[in-house]
């Protein structure tokens, strides 16, 4: 089959989950509900952290950035899917597809970096509490977040430019509900070896850094917690990182199922459904995990609601 240069491609077709009208209506309602809950929850977390000066600490600075990344992450994919269902279309422009790929990779990797940074923050808070303010200075916090944004922006740009260099066959149907890197590579007529090599090297290196940061940080955290003599002290120390551990488990577990499962067990429909877990469900649950498990967030939420009641007519 003759290849077609990318400059002549005008659009791709996102096959999504189903072509049945009734199923699409159910999907539209479900995803719209999850999207609105996700956006409202994450924006509320950001609002609470900004308005409550007691939460102006490194831990909540990182949490606010994670909530922003979650809101942007889901906004990269779900609105386009909802719009396509609404107008009964599967099309996405070529430039729109590459743009979606860029921002998807940016925010998914940013989330991984922020989770690793938050693990380091918990390590310092629990293992070096007397030096916490000195180590986690405002300058370091801003540097860690800024570096995460910049590195992942460049990382995503590299993969998007490499994707732009490929040529595609006549089949432009993507068996997914958004433009992910694996489905796009499978449509290429050109040899994607360079793309796959760069993914293996850069993705493996960044993934290894994040995983090592998580493992080393929490190995030291648990070692320190076990040395605390009182049961109350252990519970208080563990409560500091329990929410973060829950979010890491959700994000990493669902991502691992999609990208690192054996090829023999993978199918397009299965991957699409599994992708929903880490692209939509996990970001939606994160605000609930942090608000339900974190006493300071719950207290700040109550104060915010109380202030609004007082000032309401």
Swiss-Prot record:
Membrane topology designation: Multi-pass membrane protein
Organism: Pan troglodytes
Domain of life, source organism: Eukaryota
Glycosylated residues, chain numbering: 5
InterPro entries registered for this protein in UniProt: GPCR_Rhodpsn, GPCR_Rhodpsn_7TM, Olfact_rcpt
Keyword list, A-Z: Cell membrane, Disulfide bond, G-protein coupled receptor, Glycoprotein, Membrane, Olfaction, Receptor, Sensory transduction, Transducer, Transmembrane, Transmembrane helix
The name this protein goes by in its record: Olfactory receptor 1G1
Main localisation: membrane
Biological processes, Gene Ontology terms: signal transduction
GO cellular component, as recorded: plasma membrane
Disulfide bonds listed in the record: 97-189
Entry GO MF terms: G protein-coupled receptor activity; olfactory receptor activity
Similarity field: Belongs to the G-protein coupled receptor 1 family.
């Amino acid at each position: 089959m003759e290849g077609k240069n990318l400059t002549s491609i005008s659009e791709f077709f996102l096959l999504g989950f189903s072509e049945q009208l009734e199923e699409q209506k159910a999907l539209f309602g479900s995803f719209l509900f999850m999207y609105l809950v996700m956006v409202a929850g994450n924006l509320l977390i950001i609002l609470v952290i900004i308005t409550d000066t007691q939460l102006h600490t490194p831990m909540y600075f990182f949490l606010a950035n994670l909530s922003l990344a979650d809101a942007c992450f889901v906004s990269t994919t779900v609105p386009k899917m909802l719009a396509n269902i609404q107008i009964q279309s599967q099309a996405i422009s070529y430039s729109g597809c590459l743009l979606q790929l860029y921002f998807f990779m940016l925010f998914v990797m940013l989330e991984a970096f922020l989770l690793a940074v938050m693990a380091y923050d918990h390590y310092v808070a629990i293992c070096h509490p007397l030096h916490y303010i000195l180590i986690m200075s405002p300058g370091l916090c801003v540097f860690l977040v800024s570096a995460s944004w910049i590195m992942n922006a460049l990382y995503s740009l590299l993969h998007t430019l490499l994707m732009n260099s490929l040529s595609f066959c006549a089949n432009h149907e993507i068996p997914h509900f958004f433009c992910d890197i694996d489905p796009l590579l499978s449509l290429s007529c050109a040899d994607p070896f360079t793309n796959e090599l760069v993914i293996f090297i850069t993705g493996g290196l960044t993934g290894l850094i994040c995983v090592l940061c998580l493992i080393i940080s929490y190995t030291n955290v648990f070692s320190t917690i076990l040395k605390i003599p009182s049961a109350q002290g252990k519970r208080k120390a563990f409560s500091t990182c329990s929410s973060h551990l829950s979010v890491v488990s959700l994000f990493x577990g669902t991502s691992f199922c999609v990208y690192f499962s054996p090829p023999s067990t993978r199918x397009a429909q299965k991957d699409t459904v599994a992708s929903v877990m880490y692209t939509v469900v996990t970001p939606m649950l994160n605000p609930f995990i942090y608000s339900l498990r974190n006493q300071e967030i719950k207290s700040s939420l109550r104060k915010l609601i109380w202030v609004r009641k007082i000032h309401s007519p």
